[in-house]
Amino acid sequence: MARLHDYYKDIVIKEMMCKFSYASVMQVPRVTKITLNMGVGEAVSDKKLLDSAMSDLAAISAQKPLVTKARKSVAGFSIRQGYPIGCKVTLRGKRMWEFLERLLSIAIPRIRDFRGLSKKSFDGRGNYNMGVSEQIIFPEINYDAIVKIFGLDISITTTAKSDDEGLALLAAFKFPFRK
């Protein structure tokens, strides 16, 4: 199992039990899933871009991505309903913990001009969303083989009831939040 999962079981649960005075260990918030999303709007005109994005996302997540399709037709973007315009991956279990560990120890330190993650990116229910402007911060991506630099949305879903609990959970994992 991933070291971060052991760290959660040994240290984070005890910290959260003391901080929020939960009656049971089962009340302690935990990370349930991580969703990675890559929107490729240019895929309408060039199908190879979507294939490139899918291979990059598969390398980052070690899982085959799902193609996302347009829900509505938008004439301004020349998109019809059902056109493939992106891809996403939902990570759970062992792969989720391994990705979270790589994100914290390798990928986030490689972000250019990084000043910390925003504390305002919580959704009101303890889930955290962040955007990465370049997929090349991940070591699995071969810099010479990329066709185009894509952005990446990362959604961390937790069982926390509030933003304060979610922030305390992610801060216990040593997420580099702004002061």
Swiss-Prot record:
Superkingdom to which the source organism belongs: Bacteria
Keywords in alphabetical order: Ribonucleoprotein, Ribosomal protein, RNA-binding, rRNA-binding, tRNA-binding
GO CC field: ribonucleoprotein complex; ribosome
One Pfam entry name: Ribosomal_L5
UniProt keyword Ribosomal protein, yes or no: yes
RNA-binding is among the record's keywords: yes
InterPro entries referenced in this protein's UniProt entry, alphabetically: Ribosomal_uL5, Ribosomal_uL5_bac-type, Ribosomal_uL5_C, Ribosomal_uL5_dom_sf, Ribosomal_uL5_N
TM stretches of this protein: none
MF-aspect GO terms: rRNA binding; structural constituent of ribosome; tRNA binding
GO annotation terms (biological process): translation
Protein family membership: Belongs to the universal ribosomal protein uL5 family.
Subunit structure: Part of the 50S ribosomal subunit; part of the 5S rRNA/L5/L18/L25 subcomplex. Contacts the 5S rRNA and the P site tRNA. Forms a bridge to the 30S subunit in the 70S ribosome.
Protein purpose: This is one of the proteins that bind and probably mediate the attachment of the 5S RNA into the large ribosomal subunit, where it forms part of the central protuberance. In the 70S ribosome it contacts protein S13 of the 30S subunit (bridge B1b), connecting the 2 subunits; this bridge is implicated in subunit movement. Contacts the P site tRNA; the 5S rRNA and some of its associated proteins might help stabilize positioning of ribosome-bound tRNAs.
Entry protein name: Large ribosomal subunit protein uL5
Organism: Hamiltonella defensa subsp. Acyrthosiphon pisum (strain 5AT)
Taxonomic classification: Bacteria, Pseudomonadati, Pseudomonadota, Gammaproteobacteria, Enterobacterales
Encoding gene, per UniProt annotation: rplE
